[in-house]
């Protein structure tokens, strides 16, 4: 196997050096040395976007009934921002973003898109690397995209401020191969370090018993101990790979930042909401991951979310837990209670 792997690598390098061709299962060359993920046919399924945006609206209503703002953030792919460098002959039509904007408006979802912002910034700055990590923005892209998100959060919480460049130490790190590949490159990529990182306490280990999808199990619970941070909101953010290794762009903007890998976990949104009791909820997805491969059609369509219950109004109807058979299991910060309810019960509070 080792000799076969070496032979494939040599063949790949030979094609690159002699013919300027990238023979690779994951990556492809665009113009001017740009590297992208392999091109695919744009075939967005409108049924998915209807189900997805309808579910976002139900989540938004759930949050607003509890006086908690919900914000959806859609981040563009590299192929969208640097369309002019796509391989010759590939005609990109930006269908996903176009359909998403229509559906988000149709369902009245509170959202931002970073597409236009990053396209504009890309005219003067490198917001995605030329070669390294073709699937995500770089730290400059994360800086500008996050500030746009924080500006939206500030509409509800004026104490939240967009970042200044001076909030970070900025270095450049040399990368000598493509991500998850032995394909050689030589590119200096930006790395932003949060100057207030010393005030951030990670308490993720206190939630080890938290239920997470087996395929999407990244999470982080970060508490801001800087003086004055108690005035900031507590955020529950469902996020993808644009942020899963970039907590540093949000950790200092909130008093507590609870980050959950999105996709299937977002279908169980109310489970996390009830545990973390946030002041604000954010869902972030990348354009290329906003499809049925990541969010199940069945979950989006059939997930039930409890309506708000006015406890004072229904005080006479409340029943003691002791009336039902139940088990209690304590683990770290979480206490799991299993209750056997009567048939016909549709919701519990």
Identify the residue ranges that each predicted region occupies:
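Extracellular glycan-modifying ectodomains
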Residues: 1-349
